[in-house]
């Protein structure tokens, strides 16, 4: 996706030619803030999630999944227990490298 440096840098990837700067930069900033907050508040589980391209009013319903499907990773990470991850970036398939 647009938050993954590897995807933006890969000339064979689907987002390599995305012309914008602000959106992918903001996603990278969110990941950095997530890591820094997780270090600053070790007693709290702080993670970022990618719900995927979800059909909403914001995108005119063009997303490839329902809001309920997009919410799955959000709910999962909100329910992470004391031994759960912190400072990471996750989608429904698990940790996402950025």
What are these model-predicted stretches?
Residues 1-42:
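Catalytic loop of short-chain dehydrogenase/reductase
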Residues 28-32, 39-40, 44, 48-51, ...:
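C-terminal helical subdomain
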């Amino acid at each position: 996706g647009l938050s993954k440096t590897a995807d933006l840098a890969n000339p064979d990837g689907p987002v390599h030619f995305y012309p914008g700067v602000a959106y992918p930069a903001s996603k990278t900033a969110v990941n950095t803030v997530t890591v820094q907050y997780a270090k600053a508040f070790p007693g709290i589980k702080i993670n970022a999630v990618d719900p995927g391209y979800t059909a909403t009013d914001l995108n005119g319903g063009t997303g490839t999944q329902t809001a309920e499907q997009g919410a799955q990773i959000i709910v999962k990470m909100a329910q992470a227990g004391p031994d759960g991850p912190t400072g990471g970036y996750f989608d429904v398939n698990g940790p996402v490298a950025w």
